[in-house]
Amino acid sequence: MPAWRINTLYRAGALVSYGSDWPVVPTASPWPGIEAMVTRMDPYGRSDRVDSPGEAVDLPTAIRIFTRNGALVNKVPDSSGSLEAGKDADFIVLDRNLFEVPITEVGDVQVLMSVVGGKVLFDKRASSTGADRGDADESQ
């Protein structure tokens, strides 16, 4: 029996959402999960087996499942899940373009910056230089 019937459920119109499953998996990062949804392979390289390849989804669908669908499942679609006027200004900046790297590298993506409610909460570039996290403008 196929495991993680994501594509079957998605095509049937089910509201499919996904999470990292941390602490069951090695990291809370969503990127290995997104990679696995597309490749149907273990993103940690413990196995070369492709599990139920017919249940794979494409990268845009995997991202939608983690973002918009997550907001719908959590009943916050008016404020979260996508970048739109009137919604919370929550977003991240990544170290690479997900659509320009091999799908098998998506699990290795790193977040460079996290912005929540329009305020920088994490800036890897600033923290690596010993600078402030980006909260210099306290007037916001």
Task: Place the predicted regions along the sequence by residue.
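Extracellular/periplasmic ectodomains of large secreted or surface enzymes and adhesion receptors
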Residues: K124-Q140
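His/Asp/Glu-enriched, well-ordered alpha-helical/loop segment
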Residues: M1-T104, V109-G117
